Every structure is written in structure tokens, then in C-alpha cells.
Amino acid sequence: MDLSAAARKFCVKQLKKQNRIVRKNCQKLKKMSEEERHNLRLVMKKLRYTIDFCANIYPDKQVLKFQKTLSPIQSRMGYLNDVLAAELLVEKMLSAEPNAATPAWFYTAGIVIGWHQREAKFTEKKLFKDVNRFLDTKAFWDRK
């Protein structure tokens, strides 16, 4: 077996493994907890890194098409994770010095959290559509 055949075999094995895990979890996305979604986001990063590592042995057009279905999912999941982090940060800020927090602080915190929660609902709807598109996309490494 020459080096390019060995590299392709390695890549196919890794890509199939990561893709199987991502697809299995994507099918359960609507029922996942925030922690499970965060873990899915990390698994998707592993798939993306594997794709990046193996990309040069496949036609660019096929790789890019697959990456284009994965990219918006990662962006939206990242945003949803940021919303959770912001909520925790605001909560921590307000509880750190309860006597120093003025009504204006609570009002501002409510506006910030409310705005992000509204955006998160829209983002989540788009995320579900993106996931369905991803699940319908054929893996480029399975093409002959």
C-alpha cells in the first residue's frame, strides 16, 4: 500500500467515525440539554478538524460543499453557548455584590438577557433547519 492510499484509508476511518457520532447526536438535538448541546458542539469541532486535516486528498468542491453545511451549525451553536455564558455572567455579577446592585442594574440585565433569549429562539429555529440540511448531505469521502 502506497502512502497516499494509507493516508486516504486513515482519513476515511476517522471521518466516518466523527461523522457517525455527529449525525447520531444531531438527530437528538431538539431533546438535548444545554450541556449535551455543548458536547455536540465539541464533537463537531473534532469533525471539522478532521476534515481540515484530510481535505487536501479530496476534490475541493466536495469538501467545501460539506463544510458549508457544517459551518452555520457550528456558528449557531457557538452563539447559543455564548447566550448561556452571558446569562451566567450577568447572574454572577448581580449576586456578587447584592447591596451594590441598583434597580438600574437589574433593569439593564433584564434587557440584555431578554434580547439574547429572543435572538436565541430565532437562532435555534435556524439551527434545526441547518441540521436537517447537514443530515441530508452526502459525505464527500463516500463518493467514488
Whereabouts are the PLM-identified features?
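Cationic, histidine-enriched alpha-helical/coil surfaces that engage anionic ligands
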Residues: 1-144
